[in-house]
Amino acid sequence: MQRHREINLSVAVLLAIPMFGQDLTPAALAARAKAQNVPDIAYESVPNLLKLPTNVYLGEGIGVATNSKGHVFVYTRSQRTRLFEFDQRGTYIREIGEGLYGFVFAHAVRVDPQDNIWAVDEGANMVIEFNSEGRVVMTLGRRPEPSDAVAAPPPAGPAANPGKYTFDRPTDVGWDAAGNIFVSDGYGNSRVVKYDKNGRFLTSVGSKGSAPGQFNLPHTMAVDAKGNVYVGDRSNRRIQVFDDDLTSKAIYDTVGAPWAVCVSSGPHQYLFSSNSYPDGNDSTMSTVTGEIYKMELDGTILGRFGKAGKQLGEFSGVHEIDCRNPDEIYVSEIQLWRVQKIMLHPKGK
Amino acid sequence: MQKFLNVSLWLLSGGLLFAQVPDISFDSVVPFLRLLPANIHLGEAAGVATNSKGDIFVYTRTGEEATMGGSRFFTHGGSRLLEFDPTGKYMQEMGAGIYGFMFAQTVRIDSEDNIWTVDRGADVVIKFNPTGRFLMTLGRKPEAVNPAGSGGGRGGRGVPGQGVAGDNFNRPTDVAWDAAGNIFVSDAYTNARIVKLDKLGKFIKTWGSKGSGQGQFDMPNSIAVDAQGNVYVADLGNKRIEVFDNDGNFKTQFGDVGSPWAICISPGAHQYLYSSNSNPPDSMDNGEIYRMELDGKILGKFGTAGKLAKEFGTVNEIDCRTPNVLYAGELTNWRVQKLTLHP
């Protein structure tokens, strides 16, 4: 109830200051988060973070995640899609899954509580689990077999009846405390699928649309300690919250388009969501997008940080957030091929 | 009408037999294959076979690369052939970068330890000697990706479903030999036929077409030849194993082992037939492997679909050189399991 009053209040503020939106195109107006007058969180970006060997480059910084030792994993689009590991100081350690059958077009990487590394590939339509040694231990979904005929591409759009074990451009993966696996699937199927820890189908939710429980691009996802699932429903510009059985619980729709969400670990969990500068490189969007919100799990906004731009500490299309430590955030960016480590200084610390 | 009656009888008998098939206890070690170099990973483990020394050969899908050439679209790479010692330790790669490795389907080892790969993307069967040197090809890799709606053979040649009278394949699946060294190739996805060639690769005959009648096929996904030269064809889409004599004359069929994806006949005085009712890649239904006499009598079954040890993710090839020690190559689980049976 308290939150609803806040939302109404921010709408009133928006209407009371018409000057604010005067020069914005309709698209930019729509892209601006409803929440206004959100306090800024002080932060800085760590310079010269990742040290790459000669002739190893990051492409689009599509995924970033850390493990329990602080090692940083970056899943990037390059000549081939590649997965790199760095230590906590940013020193390059190794490449994982070089030449892998399931590495086609990177989308996200996450590290589970046992330090297994999970890559979500929207080109191969697969979720691939590596152990901490970098060997494949489980796969979900299946890479489509090559077509004989270039003149007959598969029909566009979602399958009429998406299979239990096949994805259509999946976007993210998460786990509850029991090890059950959640996959956001994704560009084609507009659903979230739940599997048990051994990869056996349990249930799914969602279809394309804007009603509660429907999705218009479930692009990012995080699971809290109680098993609640937070889905960044990007084109509907809202975060949808489900319980562990994928029953709809709540909707947070004041933080713009959630390109990347993350739930931090520890006894007090926070929810981060990035209203990223869109990948269309439309400059009119740059003044109204790019910020990242820090929230309580119930959707209460605590603060925001960042803005669109190419300088250190600015964000160029944040595509994934790692928030294992809620005061040391990693972000990977699309337009500017990099990963940043953001040190937050929230008030009272 | 007669055909419908036969089908009904199969279903009825299959249903009855299914309930009575004893379970065979078995063990598996996962992961079995080990010590791969950091830059070599199994993808879909489409093919697995052993040679007489017990070395294990895995033909796996790794992902192709495509290039545009004028108006044509060329693809390269996509499969690797790896050799492991009998304990599962990585030994070496064979055929790295060869022109005919596109989309791994099966690997088989003949009685002289030559290694044969069947590639469903390149439409080529390649014979390597035991040390991995190239000896012979059957079929030819398409110069570029075929246009849609092409005919039965490579590049659209031949009659759809039957192909041409020669080694011109369109998505072949398997290879086998009789005691005289004659070669049998199942040419499966676009054509639906078996091609017989002599041991030097000279075309002898072809039989089969797409359909469900006797001697017809709907995806002949796997073949095996027994010591008498009879040819067993896993007719996947028709849910049956068809048996032919050495000249391709229909003899009999077995219809109560689900959808046979992979079959294998063990060597030795008493030969057994194994057949996997593999789960389709988009499901976790079925998955059990049957052990049979050559006359089709089911002796037992083992396994089920899943991702754990002793579970199967779309078995695509079985090796049964030793009848109680099987190797199963899985598509969706990207692994090979060594299965020790205790019948």
Regions found by a protein language model. Name each.
Chain B
Residues M1-F4:
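Positively charged n-region of N-terminal signal peptides that target proteins for export
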Residues N6-L16:
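Bacterial N-terminal signal peptides
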Residues Q20-P343:
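Eukaryotic scaffold repeat domains enriched in small/polar residues
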